[in-house]
Amino acid sequence: HVSALGADTESDSDYAVTKAEGETAVREAFPRAVILRPSIVFGPEDSFFNKFAALARFLPALPLIGGGHTRFQPVFVGDVARAVAIALTRQDGRTYELGGPAVYSFKELLQLILRETGRRRALIPLPFGLATIQAAFLQILPKPLLTIDQVRLLRKDNVVSPTASGLADLGITPTSVEAVVPSYLWRFHPKGEYAGAQKQARLLSQ
């Protein structure tokens, strides 16, 4: 069962609560089921790196919600897929928290996105209170850029617990953000495919 890092019935976030309730339902029905809790997942079609890279195309600045201090441990979609395949053979009733090899602050992730897309944008600190007010209006839209529940999630770090079972316990070496994200963020670079080719050439020459 694929859940999410931060699943918690006591959370202020509806998303975190529903994920925890899903885990409980699975455990009650299948006591030996394996539960996987990934941090934010990255890959060519992800909803994090692609979203902010797209926003940087037309916004003069990007918001650092809560000052940009929230920590994340992004995990590669390919590693999550491998974890699912291995979990299907185990049925040991354990919960595994899935995170990549490095932890980044929200600010550091936005800086990485801007660097890889060749964009210069101001990063403006936005207190949680103001972010909540903005989200209240934005979430009225059909495809909101921000919701109140997302702001609530950003109040808590999204990293693997040092005592939790993880990718290593499944025999998986985590893939870094830097090894994958540049291969698809070139689409958002002002120079497009040319910038992507240059990046690949530099990586191959190292």
Question: What are the residue ranges of the model-derived segments?
Answer:
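Hydrophobic residues at beta-strand termini and immediately following loops
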Residues: 36, 64-65, 98, 126, ...
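Acceptor/aglycone-binding surface of glycosyltransferases and processive sugar-polymer synthases
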Residues: 13-20, 44-62, 107-108, 120-121, ...
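Flexible, glycine-rich beta-alpha linker
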Residues: 13-14, 34-55, 70-71, 77-78, ...
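Conserved Rossmann-fold NAD(P)-dependent oxidoreductase catalytic core, especially the SDR/UDP-sugar
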Residues: 1-29, 33-39
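Generic structural signal for helix capping and beta-alpha/helix-loop junctions
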Residues: 8-9, 43, 131
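Mid/C-terminal beta-alpha module of Rossmann-like enzyme folds, strongest
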Residues: 84-147, 161-206
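Low-complexity, charge- and small-residue-enriched intrinsically disordered regions
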Residues: 60-77, 138-162
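A conserved pocket-lining segment of Rossmann-fold NAD(P)-dependent short-chain dehydrogenase/reductase
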Residues: 54-75, 79-99
